[in-house]
Structures are given as structure tokens and as C-alpha cells.
Amino acid sequence: MGLAKRIIPCLDVDNGRVVKGVQFVDIRDAGDPVEVAKRYNEQGADEITFLDITASSDDRETTVHMVEAIASQVFIPLTVGGGIRTCEDIRRMLNAGADKVGINTAAVFNPEFVREAAQRFGSQCIVVAIDAKKVSAEGEPDKWEIFTHGGRKPTGLDAVEWAKKMVEYGAGEILLTSMDRDGTKNGFDLGVTRAISEAVHVPVIASGGVGNLDHLVDGVIEGKADAVLAASIFHFGEYSIQEAKQRMTDAGIEMRL
């Protein structure tokens, strides 16, 4: 029996509001972060991810007081990302009540930071977030590249190789977002999800593109993901967490109901 699979609603926070964009650009308001997080906690989400989406690109620190406010209302694991660049940033987030931190852009510029963070705080709280885009042409072997700064800057790094390297350096989890799928509601990029899930021995969280509950099922069964992350299908009331868990259970996936 494997570990139960997880459903993780994601709060993309911009200037103190939960927002949801399409391919990281076109933004729509989804409410107050503390209220939204509280609702998911009550609905039975397994974890919550809070991403300060302006932090890295605008070089702004993640809002510590908001993390404190969410942590005081939420009793499931909370991952916080956005603008995490130093061990001091990590310490502040963990002290504010985060259980894990997501490192994205900073890992690309300074991979040693991941090693240092894992040694200091433990791999269990270090999540490396990977934003990948498919770069292979039709008919070529599949290849995905890492992008930074909210999907705007290509790095030349191969996504699968990078994931393996980050796990070697101490990442305890990989949060994989397909930039091609983000906000499209067409489902996860199952190719890159499966490639990375099969390449590393730590949990992989699939993100980017969920439009219905069957996409969550596909992420686990076909994509081999350990957890599935979604935003807009939950934020705007199309589906509840319980409906999602029921659909996944019906498909034979072990869930915490």
C-alpha cells in the first residue's frame, strides 16, 4: 500500500489578494488569502500552497504577516513560496508558521542554496518548484526546459535533469508546473509529469492546467504524481475538495477522505 495521494489547492497571491492568471499573465481576483485558506482547510484539503507571485519578479519579500494569519487558521501543512532567496527567508517563513518552503528562481541561480537549506532545515521542508515548458518540436524526442521569473526567462536547463540534480542537492519534494498548461484547463502535461516522477525518488506535485476532476485522476494514474495541485477549479466554486477526493477514490486512488 502506497502513501495516500494528496490534493493541494494553491493560492497565488498578488498584493494581498488571491488571484488566478492564465499562463501567468491575465489575472482574476479570487478573494482574501486567509478566508480562502480557511475554506480549503474546512473542506478537507490535504495541504495548502501559498505562492507570492509578485515576490520574485518584483524582487519583493514574501508577506510574513499574511503567512502568520493563514497559519493561525489552517491546521494542514502549508508550503510558502515566492521570493525565497536566503536561509534567513526560510527561517522567517518557518517561524511564521509555514511547514515547507518552495524555492524556484533562487535555486537556478544558486543551486548550492538548496543544499545549504536542506542541510540546515531538513529536506522535508524544502520543495523545489520547477516551471517547465516543452521545447522539442513535433517528431523530436520530448524535451522540457526550465523557465524562471514567472515563466518569462528561459534557462537552457533540461527539466528532468534539473529535477534529478535538485533531489541530489536535498530537495524533499518537486513542485512541477507546466507553463504551457497553466490556466488553460486542458489538463496536466502528463509527459513531463511522468518523466520527472519516474526520474526522482521524492514526491512530485503536478501543477498547471487542471480543468476538471478527471485531470486530477490522470495526474496520478498516468502522470505518476504523488500529489495534484489546482487553483481555479476550486477558487471559483466549480468543484469542492470532497468532490475531487471522491472522484479520485472512485478511480481506485488511495486518498485521505
Swiss-Prot record:
<keyword id="KW-0963">Cytoplasm</keyword>
<comment type="similarity">
    <text>Belongs to the HisA/HisF family.</text>
</comment>
<dbReference type="InterPro" id="IPR004651">
    <property type="entry name" value="HisF"/>
</dbReference>
<protein>
    <recommendedName>
        <fullName>Imidazole glycerol phosphate synthase subunit HisF</fullName>
        <ecNumber>4.3.2.10</ecNumber>
    </recommendedName>
</protein>
<feature type="active site">
    <location>
        <position position="12"/>
    </location>
</feature>
<dbReference type="GO" id="GO:0000105">
    <property type="term" value="P:L-histidine biosynthetic process"/>
</dbReference>
<feature type="active site">
    <location>
        <position position="131"/>
    </location>
</feature>
<dbReference type="InterPro" id="IPR011060">
    <property type="entry name" value="RibuloseP-bd_barrel"/>
</dbReference>
<dbReference type="GO" id="GO:0000107">
    <property type="term" value="F:imidazoleglycerol-phosphate synthase activity"/>
</dbReference>
<keyword id="KW-0456">Lyase</keyword>
<dbReference type="InterPro" id="IPR006062">
    <property type="entry name" value="His_biosynth"/>
</dbReference>
<dbReference type="GO" id="GO:0016829">
    <property type="term" value="F:lyase activity"/>
</dbReference>
<dbReference type="InterPro" id="IPR050064">
    <property type="entry name" value="IGPS_HisA/HisF"/>
</dbReference>
<keyword id="KW-0028">Amino-acid biosynthesis</keyword>
<dbReference type="GO" id="GO:0005737">
    <property type="term" value="C:cytoplasm"/>
</dbReference>
<comment type="subunit">
    <text>Heterodimer of HisH and HisF.</text>
</comment>
<dbReference type="Pfam" id="PF00977">
    <property type="entry name" value="His_biosynth"/>
</dbReference>
<comment type="function">
    <text>IGPS catalyzes the conversion of PRFAR and glutamine to IGP, AICAR and glutamate. The HisF subunit catalyzes the cyclization activity that produces IGP and AICAR from PRFAR using the ammonia provided by the HisH subunit.</text>
</comment>
<dbReference type="InterPro" id="IPR013785">
    <property type="entry name" value="Aldolase_TIM"/>
</dbReference>
<keyword id="KW-0368">Histidine biosynthesis</keyword>
<comment type="pathway">
    <text>Amino-acid biosynthesis; L-histidine biosynthesis; L-histidine from 5-phospho-alpha-D-ribose 1-diphosphate: step 5/9.</text>
</comment>
